[in-house]
């Protein structure tokens, strides 16, 4: 099942096996309204987990449920703690709405997302993604 118009970036395939696979970083879509904010289209997409959803496509044939976002992790990283707590203490990580790449390159041409923009992206993308996981 692909999401509604409001969640067309969210793909949920419901299987019948007790296995759930989530792909929070396979997306490369940047909403049109945000594209020009980034230094370059490539830089905003390069930290994706390229083709990971295809690598695990066989799991659907085994009955697995899969949840995938098509939104680039540079827009919002659905695998980050919204509180800012590091998932990997001592290692390079990015924020919920990253402002730089893992190589330390700035992602934005100008101002970075403020609290209101982060809250908007969280409500628009992060929360529906996690609600889809929780419903499984």
Predicted features along the sequence, with ranges:
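N-terminal catalytic or cofactor-binding beta/alpha core of small enzyme domains
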Residues: 1-136
